[in-house]
Amino acid sequence: MTSRSRQAAYSGIFINETTGEFPQKEQELFEGIVAVIAVVILTWMVFWMRKVSRNVKVQLEQAVDSALQRGNHHGWALVMMVFFAVAREGLESVFFLLAAFQQDVGIWPPLGAMLGLATAVVLGFLLYWGGIRLNLGAFFKWTSLFILFVAAGLAAGAIRAFHEAGLWNHFQEIAFDMSAVLSTHSLFGTLMEGIFGYQEAPSVSEVAVWFIYLIPALVAFALPPRAGATASRSA
């Protein structure tokens, strides 16, 4: 097991054992707070990746070469930098998966997490062995779009959790009912619920929060980088 997976597993076990002692309303409140934290972290990660994706490969290679050429002290600094980067990503994974698991959609989110971890391990070995060459710019672009839709679902789930906790009781009318078209009891509906927070009969507030988050996020993501940021990267 990799260090990242161990860190995520230990953190997940601790959080799961802690939240299991909460009363129902407090647990719903905690779920909503976790979902909000996950949305903030994922959104920050998307725009950070957008900022660095153009030159990330060259910058990483130059930083590694420079650190290794300066001697053992800088080599250990590089090791610690990688360690803390992995720890940060592991914590992000814990909050994301916890927010997904709290939606109580059965075995599919844990199964998806295991498959995702296995895929990451395989891709890591292929990249290390030089079996594939990854276009990091395109990879960050499409995964960032995917993450924005995931975050929108988490935002809608947060407002639902706050309603169940008794903190938000406005606009709770059913916006539409898609159960006849895509039920959450079907395989595909369950996958959509686990990944994107899909609800077959969402409330008006859930739909509103989904659009209020996603539309500005997509617009900001589609805008070209600021001239100042571009100039600083090219300098």
Swiss-Prot record:
UniProt protein name: Ferrous iron permease EfeU
Q: Which residues lie on this side of the membrane: Periplasmic?
A: 1-28, 99-106, 160-177, 225-235
- The answer to whether the entry has keyword Iron is yes
State the gene name recorded for this protein: efeU
| Family classification | Belongs to the oxidase-dependent Fe transporter (OFeT) (TC 9.A.10.1) family.
Q: What does this protein do?
A: Uptake of Fe(2+) ions across the membrane.
The UniProt entry's GO CC annotations, sorted and at most eight, read: high-affinity iron permease complex
Offer an example of a GO molecular function term for this protein. ferrous iron transmembrane transporter activity
Topology relative to the lipid bilayer, per the entry, is:
Multi-pass membrane protein
Localization per Swiss-Prot or TrEMBL: Cell inner membrane
Q: Does the keyword Transmembrane helix apply?
A: yes
Looking at the UniProt entry, the stretches that span the membrane are 29-49, 78-98, 107-127, 139-159, 178-198, 204-224
**Main localisation:** membrane
Cytoplasmic face: residue ranges?
A: 50-77, 128-138, 199-203
One Pfam family from the UniProt entry?
FTR1
> What are the record keywords, sorted?
Cell inner membrane, Cell membrane, Ion transport, Iron, Iron transport, Membrane, Transmembrane, Transmembrane helix, Transport
Tell me the subunit arrangement: Part of a ferrous iron transporter composed of EfeU, EfeO and EfeB.
